[in-house]
Amino acid sequence: MDKWINMAESPAHKWGQIIGNFIEKTFEKEFSKFARKHKLYLDKKGTRSARPGKKVCWIDSFGNSHDLDFVLERGGTDKKIGKPVAFIESAWRRYTKHSRNKAQEIQGAIMPLVTTHKNFAPFIGVVLAGEFTEGAINQLKSLGFNVLYFPYDLVIKGFSKFGIDAGSIENTSDNDFHNKIKSWNDFEDKTKLERYLLRIN
C-alpha cells in the first residue's frame, strides 16, 4: 500500500499523468469536432445531467460498470443518454512492460459493452501513445479495435520541437522531473503542440 501511495505521489508518476492527460485532451477536441459534424453527442469526463458523477460509466448486460474515456452517442444530449455508436479509449505508457496489461484493461472495459450493444454495432477505437509492444497493439486489432498509435519517440520529438524535454529513463531523478513539470506549467503554446503532433503522426 505504501509503495502505491509513494508511486502515485512521485514526480515521475505526475509527469506521466501530464503527458497522458495532454494526449487525451488533444483527442477530446478532435472527437468534439467530429461529433458536431455528424450530429452526435460526445460524452467525456466531467459533469452531465444525464448521469451521476464526473465519470463516463456504462453498464454491461451482466450489471458490471465500466469507466470509459469517450463515448459517441446518437440522440444523446446533456440530459439524455443516447445510443452508443463509438467507444474510444486513450492511454499513455512509458514502458512496454506495462503495455499488455493496459491492452487487457481496455479490452476488459469495452468488449462486454460491445456485446451488450451489438445491435448498434458500435465502433471501437483506442489512441495509444508511448511504448506499446507490437503484441499489445495486435491483440487489440485482432478484437476489432481501430488503433491510432503515437510512438514514444514521436511524442518526445513533438515536445522537443517546443523546447520541452519530455523523455525519461528508469533512473531519471526527481529533480529532473520537477524541472519537466515546471517547463510544462510555464509552456503557453499547448495548442500548437497539439496540432504539430497530429500533423507528424
Model-identified regions with their sequence ranges:
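Interdomain/boundary linker segments immediately adjacent to catalytic/signaling cores
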Residues: 1-48, 200-201
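Active-site metal-binding core of divalent-cation-utilizing nuclease and nuclease-like domains
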Residues: 43-81
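Short, charged/polar micro-motifs that form catalytic or ligand-binding hotspots
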Residues: 13, 17, 21, 60, ...
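Phosphate/oxyanion-binding active-site loops and adjacent basic polyanion-contact surfaces
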Residues: 19-27, 63-67, 95-105
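Residue-level detector of flexible, active-site-proximal loop/helix-junction positions
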Residues: 47-51, 94, 154
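Non-catalytic C-terminal interaction segments of nucleic acid-processing enzymes
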Residues: 142-201
